């Protein structure tokens, strides 16, 4: 079994995150203005991670996707972060780690999740319990065009409960693949029919679940550098898939795509994990990089509260 120490693992993680020698991992360094070239640089960052989470960091008063891109792309214009909320090809929004931008090539990969989410993980068989609402909502979008969450207000006869169910239904239909997110307007999702958002070439080539798991595990490992099985599972929220995950990892080992690699801590304890062979070569290159103060993970972060 290969081994890696803490310093090596930290440097590899930073490199794969685009924060150390980004040119060695194909990450861009700059994105100036709201130009096509800047947009392509942002897309390359997302491609490198496999996803970019969409969320609000309340204490920072900023969107998480903007913070991630600002920290990696010199000259990044925050206005581009908002412009990217109208992703279109080559990105789409779906459940990756959480609600994320994902490269469009991953749409076939998540077919297994769209199938599983016919029964929503939070609300159960909402579509089956309210078939008329599901049909009416889909029909309305088909006839009237894209629909925001705000557009659902005022249509029900029973006040907030109808609105609550309608908003959940839109999320459930999106999770099941009936609807897709066309864009975000003021950070609110704008729903449309999937066939009007996702090109047919991506909708018609669903991956089998086993192949999809291999793809996601390998992509997750690419983003982390070194990772435990648990970390890879959490990256894509692959809950209750233990046997399938173990089988997928075994196939990746047989293909030579990954190797078992133990992280050895300062006390000599070993934590089993995985690494891609090409990243072991990257570890050797990173050994020669002169460390900078606080470049590793041993630093503190303070938040001033006024």
Task: Tell where the protein language model's regions lie, with residue ranges.
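Long, low-complexity intrinsically disordered regions
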Residues: 1-305
């Amino acid at each position: 079994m290969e081994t890696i120490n803490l310093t090596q693992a930290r440097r590899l993680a930073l490199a794969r995150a685009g924060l150390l020698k980004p040119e060695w991992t194909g990450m861009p360094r700059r994105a100036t203005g709201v130009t096509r070239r800047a947009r392509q640089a942002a897309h390359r960052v997302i491609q490198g991670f496999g996803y970019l989470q969409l969320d609000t960091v309340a204490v920072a008063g900023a969107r998480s996707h903007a913070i991630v891109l600002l920290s990696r792309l010199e000259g990044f214009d925050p206005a581009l972060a908002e412009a990217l909320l109208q992703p279109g090809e080559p990105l789409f929004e779906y459940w990756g780690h959480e609600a994320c931008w994902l490269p469009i090539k991953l749409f076939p990969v998540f077919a297994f999740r769209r199938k599983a989410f016919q029964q929503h993980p939070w609300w159960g068989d909402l579509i089956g319990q309210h078939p008329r609402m599901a049909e009416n909502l889909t029909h309305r979008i088909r006839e009237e065009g894209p629909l925001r969450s705000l557009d659902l207000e005022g249509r029900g006869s029973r006040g907030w409960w109808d609105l609550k169910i309608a908003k959940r239904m839109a999320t459930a239909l999106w999770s099941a693949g009936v609807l897709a997110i066309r864009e975000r307007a003021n950070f609110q999702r704008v729903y449309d029919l999937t066939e009007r958002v996702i090109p047919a070439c991506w909708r018609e080539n669903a991956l089998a679940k086993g192949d999809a798991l291999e793809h996601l595990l390998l992509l997750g490992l690419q983003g982390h550098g070194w990772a435990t099985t648990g970390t890879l599972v959490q990256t894509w929220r692959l809950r209750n898939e233990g046997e399938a995950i173990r089988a997928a990892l075994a196939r990746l080992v047989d293909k030579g795509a990954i190797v078992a690699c133990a992280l050895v801590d300062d006390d000599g304890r070993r934590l089993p994990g995985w690494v891609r062979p090409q990243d072991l070569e990257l570890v050797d290159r990173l050994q020669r990089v002169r460390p900078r103060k606080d470049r590793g993970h041993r630093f503190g972060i303070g938040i001033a509260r006024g």
